[in-house]
């Protein structure tokens, strides 16, 4: 009797593990694909520039033998961009399919994708170096594109934005605008990057709070 019960428990546990493995398989395969693309892509970039693989796989401070805090504020800004993007995309996933929450889900999706792109831009200096120098796209044209996208974002989602603590968004805009003005007309990294960092902090704070607010509004009792 005890042996039979043990076999049943073992079979049940095994079935549970196999079921979890099957459920995790699609995301696991995606993880393998992304990881492989990152590893191979980094090596291809190094090879294309005639550099050792270490230049694209190790930390910049280790490669340049610099202090650990080199780029500290910039790195923190990139972390905030990506954290804000992750928060928004999770919120969009939670609201997907919720009746009447389509506009909120779209707002969070757009906010997340925009934040993700800005984080990648900031981290890899896309608008500063890569696109102007390698693709011939003027930096001012990229600024104009970003401003146009932000304008469209504000107009299209204005109803949703007014349901959130939008003064935080205004503060983010002031910080970013001040950084752009200082970059174009003055020569002060302290003030340019300082106001930009404030803008990123307020942008992230706004989106963290907006995600929480909208999810609670659209899913009562959560």
Could you describe each region identified by the protein language model?
Residues 3-222:
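Polytopic alpha-helical membrane-helix bundles and their juxtamembrane interface segments
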């Amino acid at each position: 009797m005890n042996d039979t019960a043990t076999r049943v428990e073992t079979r049940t546990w095994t079935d549970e593990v196999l079921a979890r493995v099957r459920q995790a398989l699609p995301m696991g395969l995606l993880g393998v694909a992304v990881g492989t693309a990152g590893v191979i892509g980094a090596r291809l970039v190094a090879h294309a520039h005639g550099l050792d693989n270490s230049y694209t796989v190790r930390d910049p401070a280790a490669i340049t033998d610099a202090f650990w805090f080199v780029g500290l504020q910039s790195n923190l800004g990139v972390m905030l961009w990506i954290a804000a993007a992750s928060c928004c995309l999770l919120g969009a996933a939670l609201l997907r399919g919720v009746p009447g929450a389509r506009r909120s889900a779209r707002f969070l999706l757009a906010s997340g994708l925009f934040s993700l792109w800005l984080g990648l831009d900031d981290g890899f200096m896309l608008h500063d170096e890569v696109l102007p120098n390698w693709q011939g796209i003027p930096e001012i044209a990229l600024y104009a594109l970003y401003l146009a996208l932000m304008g469209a974002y504000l107009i299209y989602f204005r109803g949703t934005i007014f349901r959130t603590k939008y003064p935080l968004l205004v503060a983010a805009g002031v910080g970013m605008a001040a950084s752009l003005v200082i970059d174009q007309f003055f020569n002060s990294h302290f003030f340019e990057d300082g106001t930009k960092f404030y803008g990123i902090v307020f942008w992230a704070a706004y989106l963290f709070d907006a995600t929480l607010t909208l999810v609670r509004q659209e899913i009562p009792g959560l």
